[in-house]
Amino acid sequence: MKLKTVSLLALSMAFPFSMPSLAQGPGSQEGWNLSVGGGLLFAPSYLGDDAYQLSAVPNIQVTYGDDFFASVRGGVGYNAIKKGVWRAGPIAAYDFGRDEDGGGPFVIAGDDTDDLDGLGDVDGTIEVGGFLEYDTRPLNARIEIRQGLNGHEGLIGELSMRTGARLVVADQPVVIRVGPDVTLVDDGYNDTFFGVDAGQSAASGLDAFDADGGLLSYGLGSTVVVPFNDHVAAVTFLSYRRLAGDAADSSLVEERGSPDQVTAGFFLSYTF
């Protein structure tokens, strides 16, 4: 089975910025750094569903100073341009697709859905593109554009902004981040995940629907990071996103799901 698309999208909402960067100041991460951990993720069983599943999800991140970064969630990227508060460079990521049976390897609670029966699997996709980031600490804004080379073969644009503060609660440092997220996609992406052709309509019972591109979703994400020491950090997150445009109007979402998507979770991370 593949790790479902919703899990990666949910993690993207949860960790738009790395946990070490949240817990430490600029320039404190030199050389190679490895963070490993995992946690619990509560999210819709697929993007657009109204039923939820609980998953135990791993989180691995590798960085080299302020140059290279790689993670399961964020893909692999390189800060090719570093000028003051600006960062820009190439990025590659992998979309693990969507299983027709609605299952996943990390699900520990919640039933598999039959909403997707007759729609077929969505194959995994290699995505390549670039990003531009503005970081003044505590304000961080990021634009990322990726093109699918196979699988959905769609174009994705993600805009995110976070601001926050470092507090001390009961002698324990706490980092709070909150801000909006917007995702735009082209016709290919939306039609792959939300379109229903004549054959799929006959097999699934859903009305046929041709999904065009545009605004996929908008929402608000929040993250609370508690760095216990230089190595261990706990992360709690909560996000809400509202599907928009043809994604919200699709027969899959209107007849079997909901445009309102909530993600919550708790993670622990250890940085070597």
Regions found by a protein language model. Give the residues of each.
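Outer-envelope beta-barrel architecture signal
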Residues: 28-36, 54-56, 66-68, 84-88, ...
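Residues on the lipid-exposed face of transmembrane beta-strands in outer-membrane beta-barrel proteins
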Residues: 38-40, 58-64, 76-80, 130-134, ...
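Predominantly the C-terminal beta-signal and adjacent terminal strand-loop region
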Residues: 227-272
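Short glycine/proline- and aromatic-enriched beta-strand/turn motifs that initiate or cap beta-hairpins
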Residues: 22-76
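Cleavable N-terminal export/targeting peptides
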Residues: 1-30, 49, 247-250, 257
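C-terminal low-complexity, acidic/polar tails when present
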Residues: 209-228
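Outer-membrane pore/translocation modules
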Residues: 72-170, 175-177, 187-212, 243-247, ...
